[in-house]
Each structure stands twice: as structure tokens, then as C-alpha cells.
Amino acid sequence: MLGRLYLVVTPRPGWSLEATLDRTERALAGGVEVVQLRAKDWEARPTLALGERMLALARRYGVPFFLNDRPDLAALLGADGVHLGQNDLTPEEARRFFAGMVGRSTHAPEQALRALEEGVDYLSVGPVWETPTKPGRPAAGLAYVRWAAENLGEKPWYAIGGIDLGNLDQVLEAGARRIVVVRAILDAPDPERAARALRERLYGVA
């Protein structure tokens, strides 16, 4: 069962590998329940090097580790899952390389319904608000979150995009029970405290 609080670690320009790992570990200590490495512009070797270290952290805290976009590298690492965007390989193609869990980004109801047909293990729904993590992508808004809550049944899904402690209640009121965050934890002055606050709010609803 996938937990409610999912962190995507996108290494920041100027951060050392150790700084990235330190902030990841502090987030895990605060209660992050799923962690993903998203290093879109990195070549394979540095992605594997950081991925190995992050996977070890995830194992230490007992949470699943996902790699973004690269089922081949996910298989080499022994990752728990791979997360695919709309312009990445299809889940069927990814499973030729990789036997673990497969997640899928969706930005509209028709994409979500297709992801269900593709048999993904979970999907993300958003972006709820515009975010610099995905520049140029228009917000899908809370209406898409409400649609997901009404139509996706028992399939695990995560609201994503610009979510932080200040607007989390709106996302919960729209029906989400799982969220993906990047900046709200990764860029926080204290990632452990930020993760703990988000998790407490998430688990404060039924």
C-alpha cells in the first residue's frame, strides 16, 4: 500500500550530492512515505550514482523508491518503481525492461482513464496549481482533483503541483488523500519539520 506523502527529489543547481541526500534523509525522518528521484537532464552514470544512495536511504526508512522516466536504470538499481510522464515510454513499453511498480502522470480525465486501462499501479493528478517544477504547463486546477475523487475508485492517485501546507486543506476538501510535493519539503528551511507538518495534516482527515 502506497502512503499518502510522496516526495519527488529534483536535485537543485549548485547542490552537492551530499546536500541532496541530506535533505532527502531529513524528509524521510519527518515521515515521507514514498520517494522518487527525478533527474531529467542527467546522464545515466550520475543518475545511477545518486539513485544507489537514495535507494539505500529509502530501504533504511522502509519506504518505496521510484525513479523517474528510466525503467532501464530502475531495473539496474533494483528500484521499487518507475514513474512515467505523458511523453515518456508507455507502461507496456516500460514493463519490457522493468518488473516493478509503474506510476503515470496525468493532466486531464482522458489521460487518467487511459492510465487505468494501461494498468498502472498509481497515477498523479495535476498540476493543481502552476509550478516552476513544470514551467509552461497550465494548471489542471482543483476541478481535476474533484473529478479524480469521484471517478478513480480504489486506484491510488496523488494530487500534485504547487501543493504546500498553506493550500493543502483546499486539496483535501476537493477529495485528495495523497499528495506529491517537491518544493514544500525539498526547499523548506527544515525538511523534517515540513514533512511532519504535511503528514499530520494528511492523516488528520478520514
UniProtKB/Swiss-Prot annotation:
One of its GO terms (molecular function) is magnesium ion binding. Its EC number is 2.5.1.3. GO terms for cellular component: cytoplasm. Keywords: Magnesium, Metal-binding, Thiamine biosynthesis, Transferase. It catalyses: 2-[(2R,5Z)-2-carboxy-4-methylthiazol-5(2H)-ylidene]ethyl phosphate + 4-amino-2-methyl-5-(diphosphooxymethyl)pyrimidine + 2 H(+) = thiamine phosphate + CO2 + diphosphate; 2-(2-carboxy-4-methylthiazol-5-yl)ethyl phosphate + 4-amino-2-methyl-5-(diphosphooxymethyl)pyrimidine + 2 H(+) = thiamine phosphate + CO2 + diphosphate; 4-methyl-5-(2-phosphooxyethyl)-thiazole + 4-amino-2-methyl-5-(diphosphooxymethyl)pyrimidine + H(+) = thiamine phosphate + diphosphate. Pathway: Cofactor biosynthesis; thiamine diphosphate biosynthesis; thiamine phosphate from 4-amino-2-methyl-5-diphosphomethylpyrimidine and 4-methyl-5-(2-phosphoethyl)-thiazole: step 1/1. Binds 1 Mg(2+) ion per subunit. Condenses 4-methyl-5-(beta-hydroxyethyl)thiazole monophosphate (THZ-P) and 2-methyl-4-amino-5-hydroxymethyl pyrimidine pyrophosphate (HMP-PP) to form thiamine monophosphate (TMP). This is Thiamine-phosphate synthase. The lineage of its organism: Bacteria, Thermotogati, Deinococcota, Deinococci, Thermales. The gene is thiE.
